[in-house]
Structure formats: structure tokens, C-alpha cells
Amino acid sequence: MSNPIWQALEDRVRRRPADPVVTYIDADGQRTELSAKTLANNAAKAANALRDEAFVEAGSRLALHVPWHWQRSVWTLAAWLTGATVVPGGLPDQCDLVIAGPTEAPGVLSGQFGPTGQGEVWVVSVHPFGLPNPSLPEGCLDAATIARIQP
């Protein structure tokens, strides 16, 4: 892939795959680290999900309503891998897909962040291991479940 950030990550995977590249510490002090290999794997699966399930491609726009969490890194990198533009806090009606955290999704659906538009809303997990969301707002899809089945 020609993305310079992806190339840097691939280089890191070749040189030091187990070293952390993303460290997230939640409000309770729980620490989650993603190694270069884990970040690359998660981003590749998420990119495949975006491309194959939501038909995201170069020129697509993704509204990102994800809290400061390790998932934000994964889904931003995944969008860039597809050639899409990431719009942090983007207006849902001006984007092809909305990626939201579980606490942000209801606001997206209610119009808190602007007109809702016709695109899907995928909800990312904020579980330390990225497990599927136990409950989703009506009309949302679970990003963890969609990405997990990707090659």
C-alpha cells in the first residue's frame, strides 16, 4: 500500500512487532497497549470491513465520533488505508459512514451532531479487548463483529 503511515507501521512490524505503538489508559487507570503487529492486524481487518461491507473507497468521507481511545487509532488508520477522508466530529449527512463510540452513537442518531443523513452508523467497542458491544442503539451496527470476521 502506498500510504506513508501504513508503510511506517509495516516497517515497525518487520523490525519490532511486539513493541507497543499505541498505549491507552482509561479513566480508571486501566492500561491497554497495542503492539505494532496488533495495530496493523486490527487496522487491516477494519479497512477490509469498511471496503467490503460499507463500500468505502478513495474519496469516501467517514464521520468519526469515537472518544479518545485506542479504537480511534485503529479506525482512522483503517479509513486512510481505503483512501477515505476521516472527518473527526463530521456531520453525518455529509459523510458516507459514521463510526461512533457507544456513548456518542445516540447523539449521532438524534441529530445532536447535525442532520443524520442516510449513511450507516457503526459503533466501535470501548472494551479493553475490543469485544462486541453488549447493547447497541437501534439502527446501529456493531463494528467489532463486522471487523472480526474479516481476513
What are these regions (language model features)?
Residues 11, 49-53, 111:
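A generic secondary-structure signal
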Residues 22-56, 77:
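Conserved AMP-binding/adenylate-forming core of the ANL superfamily
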Residues 49-85, 89-90:
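Conserved AMP-binding/adenylate-forming
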Residues 21-23, 150-151:
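ATP phosphate-binding P-loop of adenylate-forming
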Residues 7-11, 34, 57:
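Cytosolic catalytic domains that perform sulfur/thiol-centered chemistry
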Residues 2-22:
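A short N-terminal helical cap/helix-turn-helix that marks the beginning
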Residues 6-7, 44, 70-73:
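Residue-level marker for well-ordered alpha-helical positions
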Residues 8, 77, 81-151:
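Structural core segment of the AMP-binding/adenylate-forming
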